[in-house]
């Protein structure tokens, strides 16, 4: 059982991970000044703060993001300078018709952008992305580490 997740919002992450580009926001828990700004923050917070899991297997680095309601055309997966994986997207608000009467608006809208610095063992030319059931999965294969060849030397004498 780890203490770190309870201190940092229950997320499974390593605060000492040199590859993460997440930025700590010291003001994220402060209430916003105006109530209208507060409502805007509540409306977009769930989507804008998209959490992404990153696990490393013996063969690859695997990133997974839950993006319910988005189509694959609304999501971008890009590599910057062959070193930084960028996952972004946007969900627009539903258009309001003149005669519509809304009783509740709970689905979030807005943009999100997450960036991850890839480690040296990433095969950036073989990155694959797929989307199924609102989950984007990005697989970055790892370079196979070859074990050094060991040659036995006969001892004379």
UniProtKB/Swiss-Prot annotation:
In terms of Pfam families, this protein maps to:
HSP20
Keyword Cytoplasm in annotation: yes
Would the keyword Ligase turn up in this protein's UniProt record?
A: no
InterPro entries from the entry? A-crystallin/Hsp20_dom (IPR002068), HSP20-like_chaperone (IPR008978), Small_HSP (IPR031107)
Q: Which locations, inside or outside the cell, does it occupy?
A: Cytoplasm
Q: Where is the sHSP domain?
A: 43-157
Record's Gene Ontology CC terms?
cytoplasm
**Major localization class:** cytoplasm
- Alphabetic keyword roster: Cytoplasm, Stress response
Family of this protein: Belongs to the small heat shock protein (HSP20) family.
**Record note on quaternary structure:** Forms oligomeric structures.
Q: Which PANTHER family match?
A: HEAT-SHOCK PROTEIN 20 FAMILY MEMBER (PTHR11527)
What's the protein name?
17.8 kDa class I heat shock protein
Q: Where does this protein come from, organism-wise?
A: Daucus carota
Classification from the root reads: Eukaryota, Viridiplantae, Streptophyta, Embryophyta, Tracheophyta
